[in-house]
Amino acid sequence: MSTKDTSGQSGYANDIRKLGEQTAHVSEQVLVQQERQRLGALEELHQSIIQIAEENSFVTPIKKDAANVHIDPRGIAVSVQQFKQLAEVLKVTHLEQETLDNFLRYTISDNDQLLDIKSVADSRYARLAEEVCQLEQEELRHLENEIISLNGNITEQTTKVIDANEKVKEECLEVSNGIERCWGLLNELETLRSTTDEGNVELGPLEETYQKWKSVDHFLQQKLHLKEQLRVLEDTRKSLSEVTKSSGNRAPDLDASEKFVTYRLLDSMWKKQFVDTTKIRDLELYPRTGKIQFQVADTIYVLAISGDQISNIQLFNDKLPAADLENNTQDLNKRFLGTSDVRRVVDFITHQQAVPQAQVH
């Protein structure tokens, strides 16, 4: 496994570990908050029980100690019934007192003279009593509506808090499950890379067919290149034959001869002065096709030059896997396509491509 792969895998593991720690922290905070809310609600209920027990003789507490006060719920129904009866008595008494108060208020004039109301059967007394009853009912309805509204708000807010907590817990659970899946995938990746390093990877039928197709395609490209070389050599042979046949019938072309000698001298000088023959073998120049061919180790490199710039780079190697050869070809074309410095390309290849199995990085 390469250092880059190991560092990447270690980075994945660190990210998963940090995410797991954050998820555990959030889950713990939610549980702590829920426990705090539960204890707070129990404390409020406990204080309410104590207050009811202290202020209401109908509720009899069971005192175990000073810190724990409990109420027997079996006696609540009887106490509530007694309390309702007492409330009715108080209500009647209150109404009588309020009626009497209103009666006196409306029947006494500014000059302290009593109005002519003989008894409670008087129509004016009945009307005033009815108005008092209506006001009382309206006030009670208003208070009951407020109580119902407050109860509804409390229930709604409590439901929202519970739903939010449940949603957070569900999200934490999903994230935890996702983290577990990530760990599983990371372990599978480590196993796959270990198996790959050991060279024990078995290719599936589809991938094996693809590799064979790439190999056949590589051979076809090499065949086309050899055909092109053969065509160039055949054209050169024909040209030389024509020159030889016509050499006895006409004066020699001094300009062509001079160009030929100059080309051979430049070719020889470049091979001797600029090429490291310990690394580069079989250097050939093809001016007619604009190509340069040489071999490093077991790989043949063909550089196509068009308009003083490299237009294409081809690699041929029967011993190198087709996928690695394709990757090296793509990398070289990506690096040097369009450049005019052929020497820099050759130097790079001799230094980086001396071992054909290693891909270019």
From Swiss-Prot:
GO terms under cellular component: kinetochore; Knl1/Spc105 complex; nucleus
Specify one Pfam family.
Kre28
Tell where it localizes. Nucleus; Chromosome, Centromere, Kinetochore
InterPro entries named among the record's database cross-references: Kre28 (IPR031361)
Task: Tell me the domain of life.
Answer: Eukaryota
Q: Give start-end ranges for the coiled-coil region(s).
A: 126-160, 220-246
**Cystine pairs:** none
Q: What is its main location?
A: nucleus
Biological process per Gene Ontology, one example term? regulation of meiosis I spindle assembly checkpoint
UniProt keywords (A-Z) are:
Centromere, Chromosome, Coiled coil, Kinetochore, Nucleus
Known partners and oligomeric status: Component of the KNL1/SPC105 complex composed of SPC105 and KRE28. Part of the ten-subunit outer kinetochore KMN network that includes the KNL1, MIS12 and NDC80 complexes.
Family per similarity comment = Belongs to the KRE28 family.
Q: What does it do?
A: Acts as a component of the outer kinetochore KNL1 complex that facilitates microtubule-kinetochore interactions and the spindle assembly checkpoint. Kinetochores, consisting of a centromere-associated inner segment and a microtubule-contacting outer segment, play a crucial role in chromosome segregation by mediating the physical connection between centromeric DNA and spindle microtubules.
What protein am I looking at? Outer kinetochore KNL1 complex subunit KRE28
The organism is Eremothecium gossypii (strain ATCC 10895 / CBS 109.51 / FGSC 9923 / NRRL Y-1056)
Phylogenetic placement of the source organism: Eukaryota, Fungi, Dikarya, Ascomycota, Saccharomycotina
